């Protein structure tokens, strides 16, 4: 007893004394503080193991502080601490189901919307049915409109009708030219027959040469070439037949020449030199000699 009195005076508790657990654990408060009137005496009296455990020496252990309410409930039941609020009245499985871990939703990063796929990629290939005959494409319009050409036989020529005498028909005779018409010309009140006028000449080369008759009373020159003529003529690069470069004089132009010579008193029975009249009355042409 003295020992107990001395120890109590020193503030120490005796070993045989009833141990009162501290109101709070040493830095291991798992739950919020509970008032003293809410003690679980009915649990201690009902369970002999728990009642006996309160008489045992309590040795605090340093445990890491749990970070979730589920861990708090399991640690309280494992250590036999009666500070839990109402956990002793429920089975452990029900407590774990009530305090399941509910993960907090994590914010998801919003990705930019992907561009829509082109329509060509989204189109699925057409379904091909089996045992369906494939029709060939229709021919082109040109081929439809055209028809194969059919060579028509040539019609035979009609035979020539036989003559009345029974002789075979002769070949057609070549066409002959009719006689030239005598063209008269009235010069200064005198009727002049041009067919009786002598052939015209030209002395452009130094020697008088005859002219060729052209048309009705007209004349053309054959000596007035590009080399020897005083009045050069163009050369034909593509001569055809007997065509040559020369000068010609129409019937009306030649009539003017005759009127001028008759007014001057020229004798028209003499050949007329047309050298001085080509430049004024003649024209350069590609003519054909007949």
Swiss-Prot record:
Keywords: DNA-binding, Nucleus, Transcription, Transcription regulation. It holds the Pfam family GAGA_bind. Residues 104-116 have a biased composition (Pro residues). InterPro entries: GAGA-bd_tscrpt_act. One of its GO terms (biological process) is response to ethylene. GO terms for cellular component: nucleus. Signal peptide: none annotated. Transcriptional regulator that specifically binds to GA-rich elements (GAGA-repeats) present in regulatory sequences of genes involved in developmental processes. This is Barley B recombinant-like protein C. It comes from Oryza sativa subsp. japonica.
């Amino acid at each position: 007893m003295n020992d107990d009195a001395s120890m109590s005076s020193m503030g120490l508790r005796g070993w045989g004394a009833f141990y009162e657990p501290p109101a709070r654990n040493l830095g291991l408060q798992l739950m919020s503080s509970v008032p003293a009137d809410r003690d679980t005496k009915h649990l201690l009296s009902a369970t002999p193991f728990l009642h006996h455990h309160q008489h045992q020496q309590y040795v605090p252990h340093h445990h890491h502080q749990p970070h979730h309410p589920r861990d708090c409930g399991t640690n309280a039941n494992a250590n036999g601490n009666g500070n839990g609020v109402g956990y002793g009245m429920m089975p452990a499985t029900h407590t774990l189901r009530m305090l399941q871990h509910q993960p907090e939703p994590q914010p998801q990063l919003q990705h930019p919307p992907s561009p829509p796929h082109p329509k060509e990629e989204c189109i699925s290939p057409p379904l091909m049915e089996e045992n369906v005959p494939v029709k060939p494409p229709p021919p082109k319009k040109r081929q439809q409109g055209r028809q194969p050409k059919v060579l028509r036989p040539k019609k035979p020529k009609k035979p020539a009708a036989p003559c009345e005498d029974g002789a075979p028909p002769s070949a057609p005779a070549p066409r002959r030219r009719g006689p030239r018409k005598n063209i008269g010309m009235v010069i200064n009140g005198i009727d002049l027959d041009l067919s009786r006028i002598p052939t015209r000449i030209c002395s452009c080369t130094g020697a008088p040469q005859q002219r060729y008759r052209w048309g009705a009373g007209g004349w053309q020159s054959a000596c007035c070439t590009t080399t020897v003529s005083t009045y050069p003529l163009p050369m034909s690069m593509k001569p055809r037949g007997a065509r040559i470069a020369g000068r010609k004089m129409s019937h009306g132009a030649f009539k003017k020449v005759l009127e001028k010579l008759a007014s001057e008193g020229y004798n028209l029975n003499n050949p007329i030199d047309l050298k001085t009249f080509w430049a004024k009355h003649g024209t350069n042409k590609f003519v054909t000699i007949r």
